[in-house]
């Protein structure tokens, strides 16, 4: 039967049709090769936007630096980074006038957090630039390496201390004449394989000590490593993102804590909240503008876009903002917060891996590392790359480029939001003192501007004034990419507003389906995604039921666990059929064991094991949840786990799901190929670390430590604890005399070994 598709929309309000416009099927684009070119683009563009600033030279590192602050006011619409200090300070003052006490309260909250935060805060986060190895590492490893080096250089670094104490060490490290670090290197040699008699390359990892003088250390401490941003849709060109090292991270964290606290108190801020809370907050601002506009007034909304937000922001401006916000606070607090922007004013961008060259005729490939770009003959490069390198050369030092202006992506999202909101705040009638007024929403570089005025000329004047005010603080609204419409229809941070925020369900489509973690987690994540979309994204009951059936089908095909009574033949069907026949209560079998699906849209919140527990055969229960089952590497499973789901737009989201430990919650083993790389030493360190921590937690089950505090104290603690426990157990008759004697002997041996060492 032919269906006329327009009939489907007869009863649907126009705004609900947004889900049919979904363009993002298929995989997003990923980047390959080096990010060196993109990073050079960023550095060159940033300098171009500030080119009329003043050049100075950093006395410590010798890096040339460009300072556009209080530079010439722009004469055209080109993006520029010439923020005016007095304008920024005035915007801050007006923001405080509109929200009495906001800065002081936020400072008090932050001060409390600064004094309580422990150093492990820095282990959160993904890849981090590890200055000791000069490349990226997982955050925890980078922190451990930094602390190790600090300690061997006579600083008091302590892994379980306060973050503020670690930051004191960072400050001291910058005053040292030199720092000694341990780096990893690899040796390659050709050997003959005994088995295959072929020649193979063997790699061995060595560690060597290296001394960095003050200048080299400072360059590394101020370095941001760069990578290419992956999985960005709707862009032809890739772009670079930055990852700072451990010296900068702690300071940035405190600044962002302060800014977050301020953003929470500003109704125009789209950060730090998200989801429905954000929609409610934003809908409020729109409602306010609609109700306050008299019947005769016009109201227009701009769906705004800023040109190169990060590259025109300036850390020196952030320093001015922080100086103002904390002006009534104690000296130590002001100092701690001002270090991050100062470090960013002196930052260096690491150019990444360099360029790959290949000669098709000679079948040769060679890599030109970034360090060589300063001296290599440019005749090997094509024209566009040659231009980039020529432009960046004056800024190069040791494979990094001096980048004083600009912020790099994702660094001070909260603080830059405060700056944006301070301009929106100036739109109140009592400040504009004319017939037009504005308000709006700001979330990092994304904004929506609502302008009210008696007539079109007033609207135009309001927009112009907003545009020019933004220019004064280094914000460049893009006239080409911003769109104005009658208030009631606009887009902000991928939320579409049409008389209320419209649920764009299609955005969530990529996160439906089977993740491939393990049978247990996948089942749980799958139903949670459907449940969440019923709550948040207008996923109706009929569609949800269909999504559920499709999910179960997908799940069964992924794990080849079709029902025990099916005709489908897979590699697993023999075992599953046998299990089906032996099971009395077939409804109790999990779907992953060939059982029926008992989920419907009413019970999505119950983990499958709980849902079927009463229906299971007793011996099946015993096998399924047997912690001693030798085939399962049981990690300790928290009652709630986190999964990463990929919506179509925006960053990967973390989503909670219920975790029940069964024989299906297996953990895949680590890929062996890492054992042949330079990461191997790190892997071994990590495993040692893990073993020590596990052992420690066995002795101190209530241990709130996550990591050892200096090796000696740890061993001593465990030995003395073992002795106490053994004596108690012996006296209460839980262990025999021989066992007690043996434990005591082992303890003495350990102490003896430590003395000899």
Swiss-Prot record:
GO molecular function, one term: nucleotide binding
Key word Protein biosynthesis present: no
Catalysed reactions, as listed in the record: RNA(n) + a ribonucleoside 5'-triphosphate = RNA(n+1) + diphosphate
InterPro entries attached to this UniProt entry: RNA-dir_pol_NSvirus, RNA_pol_PB1_influenza
Keyword annotations of the record: Eukaryotic host gene expression shutoff by virus, Eukaryotic host transcription shutoff by virus, Host cytoplasm, Host gene expression shutoff by virus, Host nucleus, Host-virus interaction, Inhibition of host RNA polymerase II by virus, Nucleotide-binding, Nucleotidyltransferase, Phosphoprotein, RNA-directed RNA polymerase, Transferase, Viral RNA replication, Viral transcription
Region Promoter-binding site: start-end pairs: 249-256
Motif (Nuclear localization signal): 187-195, 203-216
Domain of life: Viruses
A GO BP annotation: viral RNA genome replication
Polar residues bias (residue ranges): 55-64
HAMAP family: INFV_RDRP
Subunit structure: Influenza RNA polymerase is composed of three subunits: PB1, PB2 and PA. Interacts (via N-terminus) with PA (via C-terminus). Interacts (via C-terminus) with PB2 (via N-terminus); this interaction is essential for transcription initiation.
Function, as annotated: RNA-dependent RNA polymerase which is responsible for replication and transcription of virus RNA segments. The transcription of viral mRNAs occurs by a unique mechanism called cap-snatching. 5' methylated caps of cellular mRNAs are cleaved after 10-13 nucleotides by PA. In turn, these short capped RNAs are used as primers by PB1 for transcription of viral mRNAs. During virus replication, PB1 initiates RNA synthesis and copy vRNA into complementary RNA (cRNA) which in turn serves as a template for the production of more vRNAs.
Protein's name in the database: RNA-directed RNA polymerase catalytic subunit
Gene that encodes it: PB1
């Amino acid at each position: 039967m032919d269906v006329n598709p327009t009939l489907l929309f007869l009863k649907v309000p126009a705004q609900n049709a947004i889900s049919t416009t979904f363009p993002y099927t298929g995989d997003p684009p990923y980047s390959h090769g080096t990010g060196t070119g993109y990073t050079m683009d960023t550095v060159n563009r940033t300098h171009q936007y500030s080119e009329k600033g003043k050049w100075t030279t950093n006395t410590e590192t010798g890096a040339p630096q460009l300072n556009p602050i209080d530079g010439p006011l722009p004469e055209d619409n080109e993006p520029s980074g010439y923020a005016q200090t007095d304008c920024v300070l005035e915007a801050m003052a007006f923001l405080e006038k509109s929200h009495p006490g906001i800065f002081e309260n936020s400072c008090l909250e932050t001060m409390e957090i600064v004094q309580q935060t422990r150093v492990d805060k820095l282990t959160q986060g993904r890849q981090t630039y590890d200055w000791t190895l000069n490349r990226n590492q997982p955050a925890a490893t980078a922190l451990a390496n930094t602390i190790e080096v600090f300690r061997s250089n006579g600083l008091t670094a302590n892994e379980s201390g306060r973050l503020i104490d670690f930051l004191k060490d960072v400050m001291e490290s910058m005053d040292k004449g030199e720092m000694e670090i341990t780096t990893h290197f690899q040796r390659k040699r050709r050997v003959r394989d005994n088995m295959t008699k072929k020649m193979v390359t063997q790699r061995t990892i060595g560690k060597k000590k290296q001394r960095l003088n003050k200048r080299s250390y400072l360059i590394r401490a101020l370095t941001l490593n760069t990578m290419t941003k992956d999985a960005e849709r709707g862009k032809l060109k890739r772009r670079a993102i930055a990852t700072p090292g451990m010296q900068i991270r702690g300071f940035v964290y405190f600044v962002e804590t302060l800014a977050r606290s301020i953003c929470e108190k500003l109704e125009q801020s789209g950060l730090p909240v998200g989801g429905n809370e954000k929609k409610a907050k934003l809908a409020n601002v729109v409602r306010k503008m609609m109700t306050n506009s008299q019947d005769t007034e016009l109201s227009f909304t701009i769906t705004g876009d800023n040109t190169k937000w990060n590259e025109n922001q300036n850390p020196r401006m952030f320093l001015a903002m922080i100086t103002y916000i904390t002006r009534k606070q104690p000296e130590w607090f002001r100092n701690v917060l001002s270090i991050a922007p100062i470090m960013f004013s002196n930052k260096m961008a690491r150019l990444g891996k360099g360029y790959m060259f290949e000669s098709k005729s000679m079948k040769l490939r060679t890599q030109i590392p970034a360090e060589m770009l300063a001296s290599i003959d440019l005749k090997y490069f094509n024209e566009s790359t040659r231009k980039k390198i020529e432009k960046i050369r004056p800024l190069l030092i040791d494979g990094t480029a001096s980048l004083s202006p600009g912020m790099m992506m994702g660094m001070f999202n909260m603080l830059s939001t405060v700056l944006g909101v301070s301009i929106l705040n100036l739109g109140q009638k009592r400040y504009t003192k004319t017939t037009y007024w504005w308000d709006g929403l700001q979330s990092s570089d994304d904004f929506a501007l609502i302008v009210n005025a008696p007539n079109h000329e007033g609207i135009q004047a309001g927009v112009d004034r907003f545009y020019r005010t933004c220019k004064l603080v280094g914000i460049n609204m893009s006239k080409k990419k911003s769109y104005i419409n009658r208030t009631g229809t606009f887009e902000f941070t991928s939320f579409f507003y049409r008389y209320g925020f419209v649920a764009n369900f299609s955005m969530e489509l990529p996160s439906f389906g089977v993740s491939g973690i393990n049978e247990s987690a996948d089942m749980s994540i799958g139903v949670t995604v459907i449940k969440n979309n019923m709550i948040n994204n207008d996923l109706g009951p009929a569609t949800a039921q269909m999504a559920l059936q499709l999910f179960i089908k997908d799940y069964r095909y992924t794990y080849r666990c079709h029902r025990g009574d099916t005709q489908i033949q897979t590699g697993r069907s023999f075992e599953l059929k046998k299990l089906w026949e032996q099971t009395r209560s077939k409804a109790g079998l999990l779907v992953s064991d060939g059982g029926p699906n008992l989920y419907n849209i009413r019970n999505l919140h119950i983990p499958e094991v709980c849902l079927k527990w009463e229906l299971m055969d007793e011996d099946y229960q015993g096998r399924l949840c047997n912690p001693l089952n030798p085939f399962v590497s049981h990690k300790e499973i928290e009652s709630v786990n986190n999964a990463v789901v990929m919506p179509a737009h925006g960053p990967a989201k973390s989503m909670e799901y219920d975790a029940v430990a069964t024989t299906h919650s297996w953990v895949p083993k680590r890929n062996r190929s890492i054992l042949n790389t330079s990461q191997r030493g790190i892997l071994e360190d990590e495993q040692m670390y893990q073993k020590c921590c596990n052992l420690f937690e066995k002795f101190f089950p209530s241990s709130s430590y996550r990591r050892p505090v200096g090796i000696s104290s740890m061993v001593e603690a465990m030995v003395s604890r073992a002795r106490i426990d053994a004596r108690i157990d012996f006296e209460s008759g839980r262990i025999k005399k021989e066992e007690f004697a043996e434990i005591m002997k082992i303890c003495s041996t350990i102490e003896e070994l430590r003395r000899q060492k």
